[in-house]
């Protein structure tokens, strides 16, 4: 037996997960198109989400559904299914009394217990809940996106957690005929009603009558796209879309019978489909408990997450790679934190970017040290338009960067596009269209009714599709050099970031109609501060610090060495940028993703410096 084979055999087993079988039908067409779908039927699901709340309020009224820290001592405030149902019914009655006539309920603030309850009440009143990115209110100077969305959906109700916090945003809007609801404090000069008052509304038979009228086609939510290609679009999320997608996710990775109840600690924003749908809905449908994490995977905000994980042992945990990197660093110094985190954990999920191999190894080393077992890393793929998850890695795999295989009920069409495939989707989880924008809706689908998502993929093994699909970036981001060489931006960007770890947070890839590839990178300030031993290092100082520049340069040189001979992968020049991505400039989506096109356009002057005949001292010349 070879040494490498022995090493593979010596690896501890993964903790048991009852994955759905990979029984995939593969249709290969004469033009090279491939269509994949599971032969296993999609399991049955509720007609609407309020039915799940009613079910658990009846069957397990005392079980905790939602929990969130609050108050001066940051203690857990918990709401059971029974309590939630009573409050939601009262809120539903209050909304019915307002005669909304199907107009949306917009929620401007972030995740909270009140946010969740109002969302369910809006659904019961048959008015779409429309959670808006708080960044559009709190981080924008001109509120252009907020005003655009407000005019697009014309909400009848606007809810927010704290009035004074949202004062500038509220006063930028025309609130004529709109009921404003505040949770904590009203906004001076803006008429509003308190959430607590609405939650005391006496319930009549109208509530049950309204719920009885909900159909699978009833619009439950309007979720906004991140605006990476212009102004955000309001994506219609029907009750069937959301219920079916929750069923898909639960079917491919079902909870072990007799195991712990679903317990999730999650920070992902509910205005985004991954947080509001993928994280939230399966917990509700399964009768589990969702702990709202007010922490974030960024410097100064991770401590809250660490505090929570010392007390909460999740059965399923999801984060972005940056969050896992910070968590790994904390757990490597804290055995008690490791024990709490891994105690009941069956799956670690990631999204937003490719998980670096070294980070995968660090997390598995911690899992093995703590439990004697490895914990599988899982990821899925989809979009706001697909409710969101359409594929997943529902098998034990050590490979990162996959998007998996289609769920039951989903068809994945792969259309040849150069050296990869353009991906398209059809299924019960796909939206019927965009709210108020029929012209854009018509452009969403191909001649067979498949949604054109704009992403690309390749097979792990062309001869064996069941091994899965690798994400290959956005079709629209790719470009050609003047040499005619095609550059795949998605994979190059993630590889460059990984090569320059830990000092780089994200990057823009330049080179369209140029002779070579250039890179504009944002520093990871937390890592840069640790590298140079200065906790007060600013962005402006970081991009000029010799140690940071040297680390950045070494990483890219190593990347280039690995890619020798491949001009589509070689980075010839690079520069670190001090100015963070701009939301108002459309560079940063509410998912935290970088809009390559908008970023390069906004920073055209920096791009010109990259390609100057005589580059200045800030440009790192690698070739």
Which residues are covered by each model-predicted region?
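Conserved ATP-binding/catalytic segment of the ANL
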Residues: 421-481, 619-620
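Conserved AMP-binding/adenylation subdomain of ANL enzymes
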Residues: 243-263, 270-339
């Amino acid at each position: 037996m070879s040494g490498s084979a022995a090493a593979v055999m010596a690896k501890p087993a993964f903790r048991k997960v009852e994955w759905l079988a990979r029984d995939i039908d593969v249709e290969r067409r004469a033009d090279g198109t491939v269509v994949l779908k599971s032969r296993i039927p999609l399991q049955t699901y509720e007609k609407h989400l309020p039915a799940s709340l009613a079910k658990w309020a009846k069957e397990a009224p005392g079980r905790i559904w939602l929990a969130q820290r609050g108050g001066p001592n940051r203690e857990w405030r918990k709401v059971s299914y029974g309590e939630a149902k009573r409050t939601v019914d009262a809120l539903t009655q209050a909304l019915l009394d307002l005669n909304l006539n199907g107009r949306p309920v917009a929620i401007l603030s972030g995740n909270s217990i009140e946010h969740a309850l109002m969302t369910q009440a809006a659904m019961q009143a048959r008015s779409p809940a429309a959670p808006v990115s708080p960044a559009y209110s709190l981080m924008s100077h001109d509120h252009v996106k907020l005003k655009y969305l407000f005019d697009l959906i014309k909400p009848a109700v606007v809810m927010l957690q704290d009035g004074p916090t949202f004062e500038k945003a509220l006063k930028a809007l025309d609130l004529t005929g709109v009921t404003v609801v505040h949770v904590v404090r009203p906004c001076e000069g803006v008429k509003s009603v308190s959430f607590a008052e609405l939650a005391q509304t006496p319930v009549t038979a109208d509530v049950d009558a309204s719920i009885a009228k909900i159909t699978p086609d009833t619009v439950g939510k309007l979720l906004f796209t991140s605006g990476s290609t212009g102004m955000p679009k309001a994506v219609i999320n029907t009750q069937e879309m959301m219920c079916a997608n929750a069923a898909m996710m639960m079917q491919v990775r079902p909870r072990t019978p007799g195991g712990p109840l679903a317990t999730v600690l999650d920070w992902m924003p509910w205005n985004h489909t991954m947080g509001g749908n993928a994280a939230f809905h399966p917990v509700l449908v399964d009768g589990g408990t969702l702990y709202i994490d007010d922490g974030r995977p960024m410097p100064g905000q991770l401590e809250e997450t660490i505090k929570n994980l010392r007390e909460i042992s999740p059965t399923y945990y999801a984060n972005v790679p940056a969050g896992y990197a910070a968590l790994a660093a904390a757990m490597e110094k804290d055995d008690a934190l490791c024990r709490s985190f891994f105690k009941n954990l069956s799956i670690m999920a990631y999204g937003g970017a490719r998980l670096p191999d070294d980070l995968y190894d660090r997390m598995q080393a911690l899992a093995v040290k703590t439990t004697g077992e490895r914990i599988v890393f899982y990821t899925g793929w989809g979009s706001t338009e697909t409710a969101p998850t359409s594929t997943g890695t529902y098998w034990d795999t050590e490979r990162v960067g996959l998007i998996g295989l289609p769920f039951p009920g989903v068809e994945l069409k792969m259309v040849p596009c150069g050296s990869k495939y353009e991906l398209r989707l059809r299924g019960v989880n796909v939206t019927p269209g965009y709210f108020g924008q029929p012209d854009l809706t018509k452009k969403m689908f191909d001649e067979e009714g498949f949604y054109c998502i704009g992403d690309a993929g390749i097979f792990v093994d062309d001869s064996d599709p069941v091994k899965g699909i690798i994400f290959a970036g956005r079709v629209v981001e790719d470009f050609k050099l003047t040499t005619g060489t095609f550059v795949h931006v998605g994979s190059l960007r993630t590889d460059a970031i990984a090569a320059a770890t830990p000092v780089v947070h994200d990057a823009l890839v330049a080179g369209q109609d140029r002779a070579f590839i250039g890179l504009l990178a944002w520093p990871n300030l937390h890592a840069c501060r640790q590298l140079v031993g200065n906790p007060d290092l600013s962005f402006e100082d970081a991009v000029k610090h010799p140690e940071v520049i040297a680390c950045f340069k070494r990483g890219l040189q190593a990347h280039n060495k690995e890619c020798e001979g491949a001009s589509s992968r070689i980075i010839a020049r690079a520069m670190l940028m001090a100015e963070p991505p701009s939301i108002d400039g459309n560079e940063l989506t509410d998912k935290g993703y970088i809009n390559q096109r908008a970023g390069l356009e906004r920073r055209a002057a920096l791009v010109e410096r990259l390609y100057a005949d005589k580059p200045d001292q800030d440009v790192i010349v690698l070739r």
